[in-house]
């Protein structure tokens, strides 16, 4: 069953974050991940949540998403992202 990693990103260092953007895709592909949304326009429909940047990544399942997140392939890009931004990240199981 598909799983989705949903990330709210607040970029603090745009130059460093661009390094992350350039290095993350191959790590996703190695785990069957693909971007569904990556920083496009966000429009609130209800409530008070107003993320400036939102990313959604699809994986084959939750276990694979978690394996990617903790993988050695993602370790360096993750460190770059963590130093360049503040993020909230969840994984949700699809239907």
Where would I find each of the regions flagged by the language model?
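Short S/T/G/P-rich N-terminal loop/turn motif that feeds into the first structured element of a domain
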Residues: 1-70, 74, 93-95
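C-terminal end-helix/capping segment
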Residues: 82-95
């Amino acid at each position: 069953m598909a799983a989705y990693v949903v990330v709210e990103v607040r970029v603090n260092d745009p130059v460093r974050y661009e390094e992350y953007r350039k290095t993350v895709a191959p790590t996703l592909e190695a785990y069957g991940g693909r971007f569904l949304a990556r920083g496009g326009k966000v429009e609130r429909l209800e409530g008070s949540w107003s993320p400036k940047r939102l990313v959604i990544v699809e994986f084959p399942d939750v276990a694979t998403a978690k394996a990617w997140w903790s993988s050695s392939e993602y370790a360096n890009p993750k460190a770059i992202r963590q130093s360049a931004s503040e993020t909230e990240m969840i994984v949700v199981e699809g239907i």
